[in-house]
Every structure is written in C-alpha cells, then in structure tokens.
Amino acid sequence: MTAEVEPHSLLAAFKERMRIFHNGEDNNLSKMLESSESAILSLVGSKDYADPRVRELILERARYAYNDQVEFFYQNFQGDLMALSLENYKLEEKHD
C-alpha cells in the first residue's frame, strides 16, 4: 500500500478538467501535479504559481503526464514557456 500524499492545491481543478470523478487516483495525480509544478516553475523562472498562465502550464503538463505524452508538452507549449521565461527574466533584471 502506498503512503498517503498531501493533496495538491490544483488537484480539484485538474480532476474537473480531466473529468475524473473518483478519488482512487488522487495520490498519483497529486504527485503528477507536484512534479509538473516543479518543472514549470523551474523552466519559467517563477517562484510561485499565482500567475494564471503558470497554473495553466502546470495543469497542461500534468495532463500530458497523465496521458504518458509528457515529451510532447515542451514542443507544443514552447512559445508559452519561452514567453513566461523571458518575462520573468526581464522582471528579475529590473530589480538589480
């Protein structure tokens, strides 16, 4: 039996988007969301996901991971990832 994982804060939104109405996959989904959050925040240079565009990318990457297609996420969302990365880079540059 696997250990219980703290439900990710985007779990309900992800389940609604994916039309998942049971709780049997909650641990696995929370782990996918956690790894997606880590990957996206690292890629775009953000510290949190208050920006709705960042949350959207986290949900989309988790969707690709859920469907075992995560390798296609980066190609399909390259423009969004680059735009946010550059925006965050400029914001950090202004504070120096």
Annotate the PLM regions.
Residues 59, 63-67:
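Mid-chain, structured segments of secreted extracytoplasmic proteins
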Residues 66-87:
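C-terminal structural segments of small proteins and small subunits
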Residues 1-60, 87-96:
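Conserved short "hinge" loops at termini or chain/domain junctions
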